[in-house]
Amino acid sequence: MKKFEEFDLSIEVLQGIRKMGYQNPTKIQEQAIPLILQKQDVIGLAQTGTGKTLAFASGMLSNLTFNYDKIIKGVILSPTRELVIQIENEIKKIGVFTSLFFNFLDFFGM
């Protein structure tokens, strides 16, 4: 199993991951993070609690940290308000040491 330091994640994102208490990536993280860092689209399927949010967010935030210019660079869509809140909380933890600005919106109803 790899270590998070073996990925080309930004130092700030690695600090956030360490603060969260994670040592080793899960299988979905091992597979997804390198592709996301290469700015490839990824569709991943894994059970609840396996770290999918950390997988996509760590790569996305690292890419944004490396190329920060204060314009919108990332959009995450979620099917439920509850999942938006969960993703928001995780991204704030992962990105706590970055200088990135996060804005979360939820739109629901038709």
Where would I find each of the regions flagged by the language model?
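The conserved Walker
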Residues: A46-T50
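Short, well-ordered helical secondary-structure segments
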Residues: Q15, N24, G51, L64-T65
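Conserved pre-motif I regulatory segment
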Residues: M1-L45
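Generic secondary-structure boundary/loop-capping signal
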Residues: M1-F4, G51, S58, T80
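Conserved nucleic-acid-binding Ia/Ib motif block in the N-terminal RecA-like helicase ATPase lobe
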Residues: E6, I11-Y22, D69-M110
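Walker A/P-loop NTP-binding motif
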Residues: E30-V42, T53-D69, I85, E90-I94
